[in-house]
Regions:
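Second RecA-like catalytic domain
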Residues: 1-228
């Protein structure tokens, strides 16, 4: 018997495609003549994400912000972060954050989740022309800067500025500390836990860029930054 292959659309992130469809004025994604119909839950998740990013309204109409997001050839989350970066410093930082999130964490063995640590090391290595393990991330960051018309910045980033930009990309992952040591409640629902020794555990508010979670269980944070 021939092996059945699962069509990519059945498991892929549909947010970029849903934004493109909204850009063309189509309001009912379900009515399109799909070769393989994407799961309704995936369509719903994509729409919910785009609404939370301010890219579309609840009727699937593209917004002015959505048009700016759609103009950038990257995931809507990263595009929103770059578009909302309203200074040259923030735009350069947004490009570095996007590159860091696109690649495997160079400090994956480090238990601390602080993104600012990674970004500082990237910038110091780049400034000294000693890229080493940061070479791939530095290259991707340069591509993002070209896309965003940003300039390279190798000053140490402000931690709360990192958090602000992460929050633009992941608004549902803004998290407030709860009564448990190192515990937080996500804006989009669900709980996450930091190690008590994590440098971010002293902050009341954080923005989470990378995590692993399952329904009904406390999520594990990999990358985050503090918020004011």
């Amino acid at each position: 018997m021939a092996e059945q292959r699962t069509a990519e659309i059945e498991y892929a992130d549909l947010a970029p495609m849903a934004l493109d469809i909204a850009m063309f004025g189509e309001k009912n994604i379900d009515s399109l003549p799909w070769l393989t119909q994407p799961p309704r839950a995936n369509i719903s998740s994509a729409k919910d994400l785009l609404v939370s990013l301010g890219a579309i309204d609840t009727d699937n109409n593209i917004t002015p912000l959505g048009k700016r997001i759609a103009a950038l050839p990257c995931h809507p989350r990263m595009a929103r972060m770059i578009v909302c970066a309203n200074t040259a410093e923030r735009k350069a930082l947004a490009c570095d954050i996007a590159a860091l999130l696109e690649e495997k964490d160079p400090l994956a063995d480090n238990a601390d989740t602080d993104m600012t640590l990674r970004l500082s090391l990237l910038r110091r290595a780049r400034g000294k022309k000693q890229i080493g393990r940061w070479q791939r991330i530095a290259k991707i960051a340069a591509e993002y800067r070209h896309m965003a018309h940003a300039t390279e910045d190798n000053t140490d980033p402000v931690p709360t500025e990192v958090g602000l930009l992460v929050a633009y990309a992941y608004p549902e992952r803004i998290a407030m500390a709860n009564d448990n040591i190192g515990g937080y409640r996500l804006a989009g629902g669900g709980n996450i836990q930091l190690d008590s020794a994590d440098s971010l555990s002293a902050h009341t508010w954080i923005a989470v860029a990378s995590l692993y979670s399952q329904p009904g269980k406390t999520g594990r944070v990999f990358l985050a930054a503090p918020l004011n």
